[in-house]
């Protein structure tokens, strides 16, 4: 099969309620590879954001760790550092605005 899809939803401050899909493609080890996807943020009835991203992922025990470059519809480029804790069924994200 060679790929998996993870969907997530959560609150992200400036971007409001964010809905995201991650497409993980496996490398030959099966413990990492590339990731791409897109997301939508809804702040209020008049304020929406969209973004596309690509990066790399790897397994760290039961966690999935991703590093993505994100292009946001407002012209911002972010570096996202994401950890999905599969045991706890939660996600943490650190966002660094780089442009």
Language-model features: locations:
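Beta-strand-enriched cores of mature, soluble protein domains
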Residues: 1-99
């Amino acid at each position: 099969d060679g790929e998996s899809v993870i969907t997530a939803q959560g609150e992200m401050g400036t971007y409001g309620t964010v809905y995201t899909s991650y497409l993980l493609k496996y490398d030959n080890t099966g413990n990492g590879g590339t990731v791409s996807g897109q997301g939508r943020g809804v702040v209020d009835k008049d304020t929406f954001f969209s973004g596309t991203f690509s990066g790399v992922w790897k397994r760290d025990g039961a966690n999935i760790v991703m590093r993505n470059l994100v292009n946001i519809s407002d012209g911002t480029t972010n570096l996202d550092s994401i950890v999905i804790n599969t045991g706890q069924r939660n996600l943490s994200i650190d966002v660094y605005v780089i442009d």
